């Protein structure tokens, strides 16, 4: 089974991102806009209960926080992904680190750069054009975050929520 761990932003932020993703992201229909805390990983069905228990522990050790989303960035030249930048708060960093230590040992493919993908799989020319236009626009959103989600991938490639974890002591 393939799992991933994400934060979903508010509907307003998702709507803004989806307005762009419809045109620039071939994964638009597979998963809603999100901030990845742990990239997708394979696991056995019998490990799911232990994973859920560990995520409850991590959530209880993390205080709710404010998510700041703004500006447009890119991972070029590594890859042609365009994204909304997400401010790296201590809480986001803690969540990401906890999901790559101890129970969740897994090699990182990239350093943690919190972001909300709005375009990917673009040609070099299209990437440069879209990025140039979006960088001229003013984007800034903030919202309180009090939960994260464990997702699993269905056979058709779409992702769905398995469980939601509320941040802070006494919420799980």
Swiss-Prot record:
Organism, as annotated: Bacillus cereus (strain AH820)
Active site feature: 34, 115
Known EC number: 3.1.-.-
InterPro entries: 2H_phosphoesterase_YjcG-like, Cyclic_Pdiesterase, YjcG
Keywords: Hydrolase
Broad EC category: hydrolase
Top-rank taxon, per record: Bacteria
Segments traversing the membrane: none
Protein name as catalogued: Putative phosphoesterase BCAH820_1309
Protein family: Belongs to the 2H phosphoesterase superfamily. YjcG family.
Motif HXTX 1: positions: 34-37
Motif extent (HXTX 2): 115-118
GO MF annotation terms: hydrolase activity, acting on ester bonds
Gene3D superfamilies according to UniProt: Cyclic phosphodiesterase (3.90.1140.10)
PANTHER family on file: PHOSPHOESTERASE SAOUHSC_00951-RELATED, PHOSPHOESTERASE YJCG-RELATED
Source taxonomy: Bacteria, Bacillati, Bacillota, Bacilli, Bacillales
Keyword Hydrolase: yes
């Amino acid at each position: 089974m393939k799992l991933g761990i994400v934060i979903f932003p508010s509907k307003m932020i998702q709507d803004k991102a989806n307005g762009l993703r419809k045109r620039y992201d071939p994964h638009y229909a597979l998963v809603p806009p999100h901030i990845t805390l742990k990239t997708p990983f394979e696991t056995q069905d019998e490990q799911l209960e232990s994973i859920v228990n560990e995520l409850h522990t991590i959530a209880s050790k993390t205080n709710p926080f404010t998510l700041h989303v703004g500006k447009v960035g890119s991972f070029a030249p590594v890859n042609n992904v365009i994204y909304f930048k997400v401010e790296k708060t201590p809480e986001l960093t803690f969540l990401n680190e906890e999901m790559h230590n101890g129970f969740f040992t897994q090699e990182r493919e990239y350093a943690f750069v919190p972001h909300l993908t709005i375009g990917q799989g673009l040609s070099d020319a299209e990437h440069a054009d879209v990025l140039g236009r979006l960088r001229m626009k003013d984007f800034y959103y903030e919202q309180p975050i009090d939960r994260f989600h464990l997702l699993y991938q269905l056979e058709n490639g779409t992702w769905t929520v398995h469980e939601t974890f509320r941040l802070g002591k006494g919420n799980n």
